[in-house]
């Protein structure tokens, strides 16, 4: 997340961070579900 914030600068708003976290959580959930 810190790398993304540094890369995007002012474009990396709390809304963008929330969307990114939602995607990461979805991917992690899908992977966890796949392996169980």
Curated annotation (Swiss-Prot):
UniProt tissue specificity: Red blood cells.
Gene3D superfamilies in the cross-refs: Globins
MF (Gene Ontology): heme binding; metal ion binding; oxygen binding; oxygen carrier activity
Subunit structure: Heterotetramer of two alpha chains and two beta chains.
Membrane-spanning ranges: none
Start and end residues of each Globin domain: 1-36
Record function comment: Involved in oxygen transport from the lung to the various peripheral tissues.
Keywords associated with the record: Acetylation, Heme, Iron, Metal-binding, Oxygen transport, Transport
Protein family per UniProt: Belongs to the globin family.
Superkingdom per UniProt: Eukaryota
SUPFAM superfamilies (UniProt xref): Globin-like
Protein source organism: Pongo pygmaeus
Protein name listed in UniProt: Hemoglobin subunit beta
Disulfide bonds listed in the record: none
N6-acetyllysine: residues carrying this PTM: 34
InterPro entries (UniProt xref): Globin, Globin-like_sf, Globin/Proto
